[in-house]
Amino acid sequence: MARIPLEFLSITLPVLLLAYCLAIEYEVSLPTIAHTSPASNPEEYLQSIYEQLNLDLPSTCTVNHLSAFDNTPTSLLNFSTSPVEHFDAPKLPSGLNATAGEQWAFDGTSSSGRSGLLLGIYRDASYAFLGPGNFRLSLDLVWDNSTTWSTVDYLSSSTVHTCTDKVVGIWSHSADHYYVFTVTADAKHARIHFHTPDVVGAVDLYSTTPARYPDGALFPSEVSVTQNAPMLHWVEPIPGGLIDVDLKVKDTPFRWTGLGGHERWWSAKGWLDLMTHWEAVRLMAGPYVLSFWQPTSRVNGVAYPSAFLTKYGEKVFSAVSGKVSEVEDYILYRPVRMEKQARETGYEVDLVSPAQGRRWVFGLEYRNQEFEFELGDAAGGRAYVGRAKGGEVHADDKPEEPSEGVFFIEHVDVKALTVPRAYVVVSFEFGPPIHGADIWVAC
């Protein structure tokens, strides 16, 4: 669902700080970060991409094009909070400044509960110390055999076409190095094309749920709001659906079908400035689809849960409270631990609607870890895929016949994290055929 915008995965912050301090102590000449130039004129290679993918984009589409090293504006930005604007349209169309940013995110879990995909596509200048430019893409994968692979890719240009029937986003570096996502206006279908030296192929996502706001209201609604927590906006174009993944990663096949979803974030400040923790769950079990997102604000220390449950594609429950109530719908979210184990092996999700007199319970059992990172001083995060089981519990505490399925879950804690104001570039690859890390630190 979400992914921390810190791309130094699998290495602790103290290691980065040590490299930085040693460089300063011994007066090492630190390399400047290269501003990678596109292979050719963006107008030329964008036309080639359109032709490769047979993209027929009418002149009536609104085109929003930004370059990775555009100067950030000093004036106030156009920051969209419209509840009826297409969820996938750019929310910062006039450009970026040093703090505001936005993200398009897609995730998937295989029907085995053992493979998974997490994709983040960013327009974000607030983490310039992570690498060159304002446009990056993060991709985390796990295979059934527990092999994981992660990458962060920085692109030269970002172009978003907002049309009457769809939104098309192109993050590109050349005619041979690009990512393209297309989301239909009704949010019923999304497609992501990958065409890079490392990853080629496509992912298709077919929604089985209605698009929704943080309060659980369905799109479109003129009275709903997109703000989920102070200065943080979040909506779900696709709370859940069927995903078809057909990729090749360094010539290794990555193909499966299962559960998928799509989300949007945009914020006035960077995530580390706005949040101390966040939790995310996406689940499909029989006729049920559950999406859950809960950030904890660094601004006021308050958690902002947003739970949404559908059955056969129809909304049956939503909640914005994580506290037991006799009036308000709420969600309880509890870790499950085996005896003498420090870490949880899964979670139990309890959804209660006092007004309806209804309750749903789902058990989540981990099968594979999608990624884990440590950032020092107790900060870090983990994501898992696995098997889910549950359904509605009736008044006599006899549940309906439990449904089985799969889930994705993520936990991130950055409460204690502080980041030096140095520029850091880190690239990682996990799993065969290459293992390694390259680190550059520069003032």
UniProtKB/Swiss-Prot annotation:
It is an enzyme of class 5 (isomerase). GO terms for molecular function: isomerase activity. The keyword Glycoprotein applies. Residues 1-23 form the signal peptide. Pathway: Secondary metabolite biosynthesis. Its EC number is 5.5.1.-. Glycans are attached at N78, N97, N145. InterPro entries: DA_C. It comes from the Eukaryota. Keywords: Glycoprotein, Isomerase, Signal. Induction: Expression is positively regulated by the oxaleimides biosynthesis cluster-specific transcription factor poxB. Pfam families: DA_C, DA_N. Coiled coil: none annotated. Belongs to the Diels-Alderase family. Diels-Alderase; part of the gene cluster that mediates the biosynthesis of oxaleimides, cytotoxic compounds containing an unusual disubstituted succinimide moiety. The first step of the pathway is provided by the HR-PKS poxF that serves in a new mode of collaborative biosynthesis with the PKS-NRPS poxE, by providing the olefin containing amino acid substrate via the synthesis of an ACP-bound dec-4-enoate. This is Diels-Alderase poxQ. The gene is poxQ.
